[in-house]
Amino acid sequence: MHIPKQDTAGIDVLPFEEALAAAQRPQADYDVSRWLYVPPTYEEYRYILGTRGVHPLICVGINPSTAEPDRLDPTLQSAQRIARFNGYDSFLMFNVYAQRATRPDDMEKTPNAWLHGENMKAFAYLLTLCRGTPAVWAAWGSIIEKRAYLSACVADMLEIAGRQGAVWYLSLIHI
């Protein structure tokens, strides 16, 4: 279980580009040719966790929990299985808000605008990893209601995805 130690404004957060550059370097704990994990170590936040491929399913949850490469939690195990079942060669887990918290009730009450901006850079980057039309699965359910700011975060994602021509899915329904 992960309970945030403090609000993200009080911790050092790597800018997305810096975290991505670090994630491209060899890691002792996992194979970077197989995994994309940004940042590449366990932190109070996470931008991206997934497997590498040319036809990924981008899975979007609310916020990251405890998963790491080769140590997926049940949510990411399901995302990986659903991606494979639906013909994708990989999955990329992204979250509406990047703060780690096993329980959404533990998420910060007020969003960190800087962290959100960096998270949107991560989302835009994910869309470029897809050969062809990016497929984005809105996999968050009713938990989105836990914090009022989450819907504004999703609106930003929709704008970014629209510029890339992404197709959104809700469960097995095309939206």
Sequence positions of predicted segments:
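Charged, often glycine-rich, active-site loop that binds/positions anionic groups
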Residues: R100-K121
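Acidic beta-strand-to-loop metal/phosphate-binding motif
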Residues: A135-I144
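Active-site and ligand/interface coordination hotspots across diverse enzymes
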Residues: M1-D73
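Short, well-structured hydrophobic secondary-structure segments
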Residues: P56-C59, P64-A101
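Short, conserved loop/helix-junction motifs that constitute active-site signature segments
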Residues: L127-R131, I160-G162
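Conserved small/polar residues in nucleotide/adenosyl-binding loops
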Residues: I173-I175
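Charged helix-capping and loop-helix junction motifs
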Residues: P74-Q77, N119, L150-A155
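Structural alpha-beta junctions
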Residues: A83-F91, D156-S171
